[in-house]
């Protein structure tokens, strides 16, 4: 079993850790962006969140939806749906001993696709911008899963 110092010497794992940090920071930013839009537009999903803006019926007017808030929220949900599988499969892939340049290509493509997807979602850019970014990231995760299943796992 590998100890921590061996993991730190594994260049593929360290590349994975670096790109994971970037994509998780981006996802964390989306959470902050959602909260920012909710506060600045005074749009809340829960009654208790409105308490600071009024009481009773006055507070209920803040229980509503807003197109901009919903767009940021959907982009964040899309991150959750795509980054979590990348983290699991990418971790296993990075520990399976892939070629460094191939692994870095996978990681870079995924991170760039997710950043571009967010830009395309929030701007909003016309389709197929967002769809292409989604499918590139999705394809990267599938590629890592295929390589992992083909070469290292017992099926």
UniProtKB/Swiss-Prot annotation:
Localization in the cell: Endoplasmic reticulum membrane; Mitochondrion outer membrane
GO CC terms: endoplasmic reticulum; endoplasmic reticulum membrane; membrane; mitochondrial outer membrane; mitochondrion
Keywords: Acetylation, Endoplasmic reticulum, Membrane, Mitochondrion, Mitochondrion outer membrane, Transferase, Transmembrane, Transmembrane helix
Disulfide linkage: none
Residues holding glutathione: 38, 73-74, 76, 81, 121
Stored SUPFAM superfamilies: MAPEG domain-like
Leading EC class: transferase
Enzymatic reactions: RX + glutathione = an S-substituted glutathione + a halide anion + H(+)
Topology feature Cytoplasmic, residues: 34-62, 124-128
Gene3D superfamilies registered for this protein in UniProt: Membrane associated eicosanoid/glutathione metabolism-like domain
InterPro entries in the cross-refs: MAPEG-like_dom_sf, Membr-assoc_MAPEG, MGST1-like
Spans through the membrane: 10-33, 63-96, 100-123, 129-148
Topology in membrane: Multi-pass membrane protein
Lumenal side of membrane: 3-9, 97-99, 149-155
GO molecular function, one term: glutathione transferase activity
EC number: 2.5.1.18
Cited function: Conjugation of reduced glutathione to a wide number of exogenous and endogenous hydrophobic electrophiles.
Family: Belongs to the MAPEG family.
Quaternary structure and partners: Homotrimer; The trimer binds only one molecule of glutathione.
Name of protein: Microsomal glutathione S-transferase 1
